[in-house]
């Protein structure tokens, strides 16, 4: 039987991953490996900084975690998603994701969610490249696309500013 685990698949692209990487929004600069339309792996910052952002806005977007998620239902209507969905789509390879569950005392308990029969799967995303106008520094960043939660995830992701959401998990055909 051929090994088809995440380590094998990532080795095909000569990418080395840490044994365990946990990424939670609002914590120190998480980065992920992203597959963009060119089938090329890139390391990008999670939390989109739109290419049109002024330097002071770029810092605020990063600091306040404003663009971590984009609703699939509004991709074609809202800025900055509408300028990215056609040419700046990406695939975010993951082994799982965290979702918060609001307890009766208002605190959040995080659940790590995986797929039953796949140790590596993909989440849909959008990406952009921002260039600092004075220094020329380039920042590649991305946002996860979210959709309405399925029945299981509704029980978990039940509160906060965007309840009943989950990442848009791609099928192998997509």
Predicted regions and their residues:
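Short linear sequence motif anchored by a di-proline
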Residues: 1-174
